[in-house]
Design a protein with these regions (language model features):
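Hydrophobic transmembrane alpha-helices
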Residues: 2-65
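Membrane-helix interfacial "entry" motifs
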Residues: 3, 7, 11, 71-78, ...
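Hydrophobic alpha-helical transmembrane segments
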Residues: 12-17, 60-64, 80, 84, ...
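Interfacial aromatic-anchored transmembrane helix boundaries in multi-pass membrane proteins
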Residues: 27-36, 66-97
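Membrane-water interface at transmembrane helix exits
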Residues: 30, 52, 70, 74, ...
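Residue-level hotspots within the lipid-embedded alpha helices of multi-pass solute transporters
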Residues: 37, 82-83, 171-176
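Short helix-perturbing small/polar motifs within transmembrane alpha-helices
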Residues: 83-126
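Membrane-embedded alpha-helical hairpins and interfacial helices in multi-pass inner-membrane proteins
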Residues: 109-196, 201, 205
Length: 212
């Protein structure tokens, strides 16, 4: 009976605590001018940890709690943006590792979710600020292509299609690295919190060893 009551209490306390922690990380990421890269890495970890410790139902409750908290604190657009991709990605990775799915599945679906979430954020923020932020991304893509062409001294002028394609490929690559880094970070940290994720594939053991 005591054990049952303890579990019930933890099922209430842990979602509240970890959802609040994740919400604070999101607020810090949104408003603080420094530490963005580190905050992005640790932002999904509280919900993932909740999933591993308490299961899918409790993790979903924690995600809903975080959504409601941020919706109240930051408004409908800024509060909802944490879902894309951080909230959804955290739930997916937590579910994958809770079900002991292999890294290839959790990573591949994870970076797809991350890429889709990036485009949703660009659209939402463009609506919020009243400017097309995709233009800024394509300009950055053109600048990268221009530097590469100039470095190799190539007689090449990229078309708008190539510029857009390079921008999309860069976003996909960024999300691939980001999700893989979360895997390595979780594999390193979670055993110290009495939670484990599946072992990495042999092919990427070298990256994991570097991360550890």
């Amino acid at each position: 009976m005591k054990l049952s009551k303890k579990n019930e209490a933890l099922n209430i306390i842990e979602p509240s605590y970890l959802a609040s922690l994740s919400s604070l990380l999101w607020v810090a990421l949104y408003y603080l001018p420094i530490g963005g890269a580190l905050l992005r890495l640790i932002l999904p970890l509280p919900i993932i940890l909740l999933h591993l410790r308490r299961g899918t139902r409790t993790a979903f409750e924690g995600l809903i709690l975080q959504f409601l908290l941020l919706f109240i604190l930051m408004g409908p657009i800024r509060g909802t943006l944490f879902l894309f991709p951080y909230g959804i990605l955290a739930f997916w990775l937590g579910w994958s590792w809770f079900k002991e799915k292999n890294w290839w599945l959790s990573w591949s679906v994870g970076f797809i979710l991350g890429t889709l979430g990036f485009f949703i954020r660009v659209f939402a923020l463009s609506t919020l600020v009243g400017d097309n932020l995709w233009i800024i991304i394509t300009r950055a893509s053109f600048g990268l292509i221009d530097k590469f062409v100039g470095l190799l001294n190539l007689p090449f002028s990229p078309s708008i299609i190539i510029i857009q394609l390079v921008a999309i490929l860069l976003i996909i690559f960024q999300e691939m690295v980001y999700v893989l880094t979360i895997h390595i970070l979780a594999y390193s940290l979670f055993p110290r919190l009495n939670s484990n994720i599946p072992d990495p594939p042999k092919m990427i053991n070298g990256f994991v060893d570097i991360g550890l």
